[in-house]
């Protein structure tokens, strides 16, 4: 019997990687924007730092809760579809065999071979075959709510800590340029890392994240300066 070589593919990381990159990006961007907005409104250094810490804590909890609820909803939908598929297999095994064969025919197999493949797969694991080929549910892409929530919250906290650390040590007079400059560097590094981990172009990933980060921080700082002037 031939020994199968186990291969590692990037799609296996997609669940936790997406949550981690999103969390870290949000952590850097939202905290830096919050700090810049409050600082632009002429708040004291202490008040700016307190606002940043509050943003870190609130953001981490919000990311964890939102990610958990979102991914859990996906998992609930998957389970409902699997339950329906089990019932259909029990009620009409022949019809499900024809349905599976039709899927393989649509993918390019000739009808005789498609029926044979469907028969063999259903004899081995009917539910697994239908989950994978009809519903698009596999172990690799199965929703994992707790894993996604922890990855999202942890990465948000790590990302938020970066501009917060700069805020803590930067002199008040240079706080805005230092926080904005270092945060853009952090975002560029994160964008490059995420692109590399996903197998995409590093430069394009870094530029994309940095552009939107710069835009968000500029808008937030502008609003803060406007309210500071009005006040």
Regions found by a protein language model. Give the residues of each.
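Transmembrane alpha-helical segments and their cytosolic interface motifs
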Residues: 16-34, 139-165
């Amino acid at each position: 019997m031939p020994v199968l070589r186990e291969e590692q593919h990037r799609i296996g990381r997609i669940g936790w990687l997406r949550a981690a990159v999103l969390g870290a990006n949000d952590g850097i961007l939202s905290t830096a924007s919050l700090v810049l907005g409050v600082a632009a409104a002429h708040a004291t250094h202490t008040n700016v730092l307190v606002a940043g810490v509050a943003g870190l804590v609130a953001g981490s909890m919000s990311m964890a809760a939102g990610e958990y609820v979102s991914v859990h909803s996906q998992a609930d939908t998957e389970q409902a579809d699997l339950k329906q598929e089990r019932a259909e297999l029990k009620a009409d095994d022949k019809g499900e065999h024809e349905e599976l064969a039709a899927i393989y025919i649509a993918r390019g197999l000739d009808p005789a071979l498609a029926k044979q493949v469907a028969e063999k797969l259903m004899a081995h694991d009917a539910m697994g075959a239908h989950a994978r080929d009809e519903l698009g549910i596999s172990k690799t892409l199965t929703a994992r709510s707790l894993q996604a929530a922890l990855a999202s919250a942890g990465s948000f906290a790590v990302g938020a800590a970066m501009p917060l650390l700069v805020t803590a040590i930067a002199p008040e007079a240079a706080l805005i340029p230092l926080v904005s400059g270092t945060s853009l560097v952090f975002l560029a590094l994160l964008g490059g890392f995420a692109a590399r981990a996903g197998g995409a172009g590093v430069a394009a990933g870094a530029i994309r994240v940095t552009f939107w980060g710069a835009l968000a921080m500029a808008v937030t700082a502008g609003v803060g300066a406007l309210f500071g002037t009005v006040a």
